[in-house]
Regions:
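Amphipathic alpha-helical
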Residues: 2-3
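C-terminal (or distal) subdomains of carbohydrate-active enzymes
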Residues: 12, 17-427
């Protein structure tokens, strides 16, 4: 209701038309993606923190999707990414980055495999996960139905499964002009004392994972060389996990599945694979204090982003977590604020009115790479920009050299993971 009221206020304030359709981008990233409008896919482009009429936002794809159907395999490709699904088990047996010309899955391995593990913590069922669950697991491989839908903008493979007391519907999606493969699973969950994981055996020689946290990311080792490392068998990240080797990386981006683990994948001392097994924790079913937690239907979404960087991982995370909004009425609103990188990466975390009711605009950003960065902040209005603290009070020793006169563009120099709050005043 709050968003509906805000949209109606925007329509009235901007003199927009009540007919037609507009797209609203609530995120800090420019978006170019396939969106379903009136039950049909369209490729749209909307600037960061802006609104655009649907008519002006639609584009033709540069890399349309094509599907090849074989006896035992279905291949989806858009000229950027090639995905192959084995029709016998509905699992992904190949993901090729066509731009970098490399296979992303370990040889002979399958991705997007659901596995049910026993889950019996010694105590505190709902809060603890113990690594004994790794010693056994039941793959959810049996296919009850498999269907394919395709167009030049989007191809999907839908796989239905049943295991234990639960049913699963997995969907694998490849969109035009996209370097990400999207996965979703609809679960009717009825398990007891089990944990559901999904596997991605990746041919990436990563020594550590970078997991997003608020205002940055944390780097965690993959090899368990110490008892401390061994105790980190399950980690928490927010929207993405980046796995990198020199000159290449992939990212697992999620919508709500924050728990994950990464370990060296397979092989032995004579034939090491140099890859990693990355797994997301999707659902659990502890028995205490609530004997029936999470029972029922769930819709979970995650994606694999090829040739990833911290910046592109943030953009993909915005696509999953801050979807474009389809609104009735036609209005054009420019970007309230956006970041233009010079070198490095910064992310806008908040754009809001000042607490004191002055009408000033407060913008909070952070440096996301963990390195020194230079960026430009572009505003939709002229204003006097000053640096404030988290409570929006002036600071005695500002970190930025900001112009004294009003402007709509400022240069910023950020320290690693620096959080910067700016106030834009019209006076």
């Amino acid at each position: 209701q709050l968003m509906d009221d805000a949209w109606q206020a925007l329509l009235q304030a901007s003199g927009g038309e009540t007919v037609g359709v507009s797209l609203v981008n609530p995120s800090q990233a420019d978006r170019r993606e396939v969106l379903t409008v009136s039950d049909r896919p369209v490729l749209v482009q909307v600037p960061a923190m802006a609104a655009k009429s649907l008519t002006d936002a639609v584009f033709d794809p540069e890399h349309p999707v094509h599907v090849q159907r074989g006896r035992d395999a279905i291949r989806m490709t858009n000229g950027l990414v090639d995905v192959c699904i084995d029709t016998r088990d509905g699992l992904v047996n190949s993901i090729v980055d066509l731009v970098s010309d490399r296979e992303l899955l370990l040889s002979g391995q399958r991705a997007n495999r659901l596995v049910l593990h026993p889950d019996y913590p010694d105590c505190f069922d709902a809060w603890e996960l113990q690594q004994q669950y790794r010693h056994s697991g039941d793959p959810v491989d049996r296919v009850t139905d498999l269907r394919v839908t395709e167009s030049l903008l989007r191809a999907q493979v839908r796989v239905e499964r049943h295991a234990g007391q639960s049913s699963f519907v997995q969907t694998i999606t490849l969109d035009a002009d996209s370097r990400a493969v999207e996965f979703s699973v609809d679960v009717d969950w009825a398990e007891r004392a089990r944990v559901l994981k999904v596997d991605f055996p990746l041919d990436v020689a990563a020594r550590s994972s970078r997991d997003e946290i608020q205002f940055g990311h944390i780097e965690r080792p993959i090899e368990a060389n110490t008892s401390w490392d061994d105790a980190h068998f399950e980690s928490c990240g927010q929207q993405w996990m980046l796995l990198a080797e020199p000159r290449y990386a992939v990212a697992l981006v999620n919508q709500s599945s924050y728990g994950h683990d990464v370990s060296p994948a397979g092989g032995d001392e004579h034939t090491p694979t140099m890859g990693v097994m990355a797994r997301l924790t999707l659902l659990r079913s502890p028995q205490s204090p609530d004997p029936h937690p999470d029972q029922g239907c769930h819709h979970l979404v995650y994606s694999l982003l090829t040739d990833a960087r911290v910046e592109s991982a943030h953009v993909e995370a915005a696509r999953l977590n801050q979807p474009l909004q389809v609104r009735s009425g036609t209005v054009e609103l420019p970007s309230t604020a956006r970041i233009e990188p010079v070198h490095g990466t910064a992310v806008i975390d908040a754009v809001k009115q000042a607490f004191d009711g002055s009408g000033d605009l407060v913008i909070r950003i952070h440096e996301a790479e963990g390195a020194r960065s230079r960026v430009r902040l572009l505003l939709d209005r002229d204003g006097c920009v000053s640096e404030v603290d988290l409570l929006e009070d002036p600071i005695d020793e500002p970190t930025q050299q900001l112009p004294a006169s009003t402007c709509s563009r400022v240069e910023l120099t950020l320290r690693p993971f620096q959080i910067l709050t700016l106030r834009v005043s019209q006076r």
